[in-house]
Curated annotation (Swiss-Prot):
Limits of the PDEase domain: 539-875
Protein name: High affinity cAMP-specific and IBMX-insensitive 3',5'-cyclic phosphodiesterase 8B
Pathway assignment: Purine metabolism; 3',5'-cyclic AMP degradation; AMP from 3',5'-cyclic AMP: step 1/1
Source domain of life: Eukaryota
Gene name linked to the record: PDE8B
Family matches, as SMART domains: HDc, PAS
Polar residues compositional bias, start-end: 23-34, 422-436
Regulation: Inhibited by dipyridimole. Insensitive to selective PDE inhibitors including rolipram and milrinone as well as to the non-selective inhibitor, IBMX. Unaffected by cGMP.
Organism, as annotated: Homo sapiens
Role summary: Hydrolyzes the second messenger cAMP, which is a key regulator of many important physiological processes. May be involved in specific signaling in the thyroid gland.
PAS domain boundaries: 267-338
Highest classification ranks of the organism: Eukaryota, Metazoa, Chordata, Craniata, Vertebrata
Amino acid sequence: MGCAPSIHVSQSGVIYCRDSDESSSPRQTTSVSQGPAAPLPGLFVQTDAADAIPPSRASGPPSVARVRRARTELGSGSSAGSAAPAATTSRGRRRHCCSSAEAETQTCYTSVKQVSSAEVRIGPMRLTQDPIQVLLIFAKEDSQSDGFWWACDRAGYRCNIARTPESALECFLDKHHEIIVIDHRQTQNFDAEAVCRSIRATNPSEHTVILAVVSRVSDDHEEASVLPLLHAGFNRRFMENSSIIACYNELIQIEHGEVRSQFKLRACNSVFTALDHCHEAIEITSDDHVIQYVNPAFERMMGYHKGELLGKELADLPKSDKNRADLLDTINTCIKKGKEWQGVYYARRKSGDSIQQHVKITPVIGQGGKIRHFVSLKKLCCTTDNNKQIHKIHRDSGDNSQTEPHSFRYKNRRKESIDVKSISSRGSDAPSLQNRRYPSMARIHSMTIEAPITKVINIINAAQENSPVTVAEALDRVLEILRTTELYSPQLGTKDEDPHTSDLVGGLMTDGLRRLSGNEYVFTKNVHQSHSHLAMPITINDVPPCISQLLDNEESWDFNIFELEAITHKRPLVYLGLKVFSRFGVCEFLNCSETTLRAWFQVIEANYHSSNAYHNSTHAADVLHATAFFLGKERVKGSLDQLDEVAALIAATVHDVDHPGRTNSFLCNAGSELAVLYNDTAVLESHHTALAFQLTVKDTKCNIFKNIDRNHYRTLRQAIIDMVLATEMTKHFEHVNKFVNSINKPMAAEIEGSDCECNPAGKNFPENQILIKRMMIKCADVANPCRPLDLCIEWAGRISEEYFAQTDEEKRQGLPVVMPVFDRNTCSIPKSQISFIDYFITDMFDAWDAFAHLPALMQHLADNYKHWKTLDDLKCKSLRLPSDS
């Protein structure tokens, strides 16, 4: 049983007849308005969209009498009769159960009705459009008004009918219709163009589409121009046609055309509101640099009113003379290619003062896939020179601290960093995010000296503010990664399917992977080997002819270091070192005599342990040979100066001096004196460099540094230390990744003539020279897999034997076995070599080859890998097939 609709009378005489919210009876929502010169019964009828199309045109739109009857019937609680078919729809029911009503509606028009509430996109914005409202302004009911009324019903639009200009304007101001249809066929009742102008004079009409219904023109008359209608404020003209489908098609076209476009334009108001309240100065120009928009922050920053800027070309504005002469050309070249430009730019304010800005210019692609606009974001650099200008901007604009950007508020406490504003709330955890970040952000802002990583974090935090939630969360994860100490090192996981790789990682890349609680075991081997009696230094003429003849080939990569080891009775370092150092003019650079250099080599070689299977002076000579070979490559030679070359040769010579034949993990687990001394961090590498300098400077007879000035010595010493420490395997991936990102990629971009705005390779920059030297000695240190096959096999046997001996001692002393696969009874040497090459060698030498061009080495690497792979496929665990032994 239905409930009577409630009736409200406005002061202007408008009577609204609304459904009772508690009613569930099916009935039509109607409202009746009284115009100033009309009787009370009604001058316009509103109907919400029906769920079904009336069965016939004959039933027509409800007349005044029908509305009265519908109101009476609804008031008595009965359903509307057939005299008013629109009143018999399920609209009342839909107010209470929309989903069920839609499911029950099975007409061919249902999908059409849903269009009006479909999602609309404008750029990244998602909008939901409310059902379309249509206002029909017809002085009297006729077939044309009926046609539009039923077309609205079919399309699912809400419709109002007004009979007078006054009631039409009142209704429009109340409901803000998207479409207005005005009867322009007759002039005796009202002036259609005057009605249109009166509506256009109101603010809500800015995005309304107004349609003029004009009389059909006979064939013998010329059609009138549409310009007077457009000048009056109409958007479209509709030639009289009372067909419902013709009216329906017209309305649907308007909805998907002008109404949808106007809806998007109306949504742009929110974007402009955001721009107006943005702290960054924003400037939008056309493709030919005519200023189209500036926000209030831009006006405050530059001292201009927007009226002074809009429509002007950027070239007409005063320029600062503090910029580079070619800066504007550089910027234009970049943005004309459709690429973003970012950098520091000096701008001139209206007052004539120059201010330094962080500027980001983004091209915007428009019609035809061409650049149509440029958007510039500008922020003041908070430098000392800008402080006065910032104060002046504040004073002129009258901004208080509540509206100032952070870059202004922290102007006296920060230098040269991107502003970080308060982190906007995101999702349900926003309060916790904000509370968690604020103290740290405040501390970052208060820094007077900022590290590069701090600036990076500032930029990311600033980017989070205007990012979608998913992007902000991803940037949170980025920040967590950046706050770790191992930025370039991969996360090392255990490879169950490859125990060799797992053990190599554990044994070479960790210090004391499995520690004992109290260092119960002490490494007792004397790693500070006492000096053996040294023979008198030899002269160049004392070198035996057989050694001299062998050294004639030392510049070749295929030089056989083991032949030199045998012929020199395991003292190859002195002989090879003298030859290599002479070739690179080391004595001349250090201003030392050859006698001093020979004495130094003898002292260093004496402190290598000949009892070690691998880490002995032959390995040092091999690394020195590889380093010298790399220094002879054209690109390496062009990247380093002589001091770098001398430092590299010395570092290669001493890089493993006094090596005990055990890994860092072993020393840490054993609680050795060296591990305690160096806090379990880079134990051996720190010891090698420290001992090398101790041995060098304690005796003037072998002090090769005694004749260079203090500054040169400090620079040389730092370079040597840095290179030796780079051989520590825990930093392996960090060094390789830095080299690839800082050297290889920029160099590749240069070679390929890329248009990207990246910095040049800058190989001669000090920071890049450091990366090159680190990479060079790392490759020289583990170049065995890139040697000719016979040499590669010999080195593989030696390193395996040293690891076997360590495993034996770990078991004997009850220490953790850090590399269990290196058990001499079960180990597969081919598998261990394959794992070492796959995990450590291939990527590093690919990167080094891309820089230094080493095709012969890469071929050896491929051949050797094939050798080990063949042995492994045959289940052979030794260095060679039994038939080859």
